[in-house]
Design a protein with these regions (language model features):
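An N-terminal structural lobe/cap that precedes and organizes the functional/catalytic core
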Residues: 4-85
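Sparse, context-dependent recognition of short Cys/His-centered cofactor- or disulfide-binding micro-motifs
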Residues: 17, 49, 122, 206, ...
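C-terminal accessory domains and tails appended to enzymatic cores
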Residues: 29, 59-60, 75, 84-91, ...
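Short, hydrophobic/amphipathic alpha-helical patches that form generic packing surfaces
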Residues: 33-40, 99-107, 135-142, 160-164, ...
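Short helix-capping/linker segments at secondary-structure and domain boundaries
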Residues: 41-45, 106-115, 168-172
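A basic- and aromatic-enriched beta-loop-alpha substructure that forms the phosphate/nucleotide-
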Residues: 64-151
Length: 333
């Protein structure tokens, strides 16, 4: 099997890119993550060599965090040279090996692992990995991750510190190389799970956007499963003439009815366009079951009135329950 690394400047296949070089000795999060990214992209055919030998580095196809050269056309990704000043776009965070590899190969890795994503979703996921993983790792590697607490130097617990803990007493021993590859395997698993989770989230966001568009004229958004609807609903209400007041979705054999904030400003994060009837707030168990909304028995209502559950058999019954909430609010307005 031949796996391709592709970017705007060069294409390399595993038939010629079997060897990835990084430095030996003490290892850090930036080159372990970078090696993990490349290993996931190239697959089982990749061969990782840890060395500082200039001749070996010169003959390698891909070299990261070693060699004193950054040249994407030559697949050289070091950041230690004095003239290197590249930063993560829009920030002052200097790039290290993790960010450099992700900059050039992240999109290719995402499309390989998640071909179901469209171009915009790939861009969003790339940005998420860059912000969540690469920037903090590079920040730490370049010495920008230290902050002061009550006048003393302190560091947050970071993935960089986790990686550093694997270093052996003799950093040039075979055990050090074995430890490095253990970290790479751990990071590969983390990267796979992070990408899977974020890709799934993007798909759910897309489903939510489609549901909102399809029901734009309604005051009740009815979902056939829970979706991360908040962003899509607030955008529709603010920019697309939407008038959504409530959302309802199935949950564990019942239907939840949830309020929608006035807008997406921080001060209105917990606001409610329409609140559930105050007479229901905090009800649970037998007390709740004595009440109903639109013909569906109440299961519970949160004490702040932002969420309730009803025993509705169908989506239409849940809609009627939500519409009853709106009608009661209008009657008291």
């Amino acid at each position: 099997m031949t796996t391709s690394i592709e970017n705007t400047q060069t294409t390399v296949t595993t038939s010629t890119a079997k060897t990835v070089i990084t430095h030996n000795g003490l290892f850090h999060a930036d080159e372990t993550f970078g090696t993990a990214f490349l290993s996931l992209l190239l697959g089982s055919e990749v061969r990782v060599v840890r060395t500082r030998n200039p001749q070996v580095i010169e003959e390698a196809c891909v070299a990261l965090d070693v060699g004193g050269e950054y040249d994407n056309a030559k697949l050289r990704y070091d950041h230690h040279q004095r003239e290197f000043t590249d930063v993560h776009e829009g920030t002052s965070v200097k790039l290290a090996a993790c960010g450099l590899i992700w900059r050039h190969f992240g999109t290719c890795l995402i499309t390989k692992l998640h071909p179901e994503l469209d171009i915009e979703q790939v861009k969003t996921l790339w940005q998420s990995v860059d912000e969540t993983i690469c920037r903090p790792v590079d920040l730490q590697d370049n010495g920008q991750g230290t902050f002061k607490v009550e006048g003393a130097e302190a560091q947050a617990l970071t993935v960089s510190m986790m990686v550093a803990a694997f270093n052996q007493q003799d950093i040039y021993s075979p055990a050090q190389d074995e430890a490095f590859m253990r970290v790479v395997e751990i990071l590969k698993e983390y990267i796979l799970n992070f990408l899977r989770s974020e890709a799934n989230k993007l798909q759910l966001l897309k489903e939510a956007e489609e549901a909102v568009k399809a029901q734009l004229g309604s005051r009740v958004l009815v979902l056939d499963k829970f979706l991360p609807y908040r962003e899509a609903v607030l955008k529709a209400n603010a920019e697309e003439g939407g008038q959504f007041d409530l959302v309802t979705y199935p949950a564990q054999g019942q239907w939840n009815i949830q309020t929608i904030p006035v807008d997406d400003t921080p001060e209105n994060f917990y606001s409610q366009r329409v609140s559930l009837p105050q007479r229901l707030w905090g009800l649970t168990g037998p007390d709740a079951s004595k009440e109903s909304l639109g013909g569906s028995a109440l299961v519970f209502c949160h004490k702040t009135g932002f969420l309730a559950a009803v025993k509705a058999d169908t989506a239409e019954a849940a809609r009627k329950a939500a519409e009853a909430v709106i009608a009661e609010a209008q009657a008291k307005a």
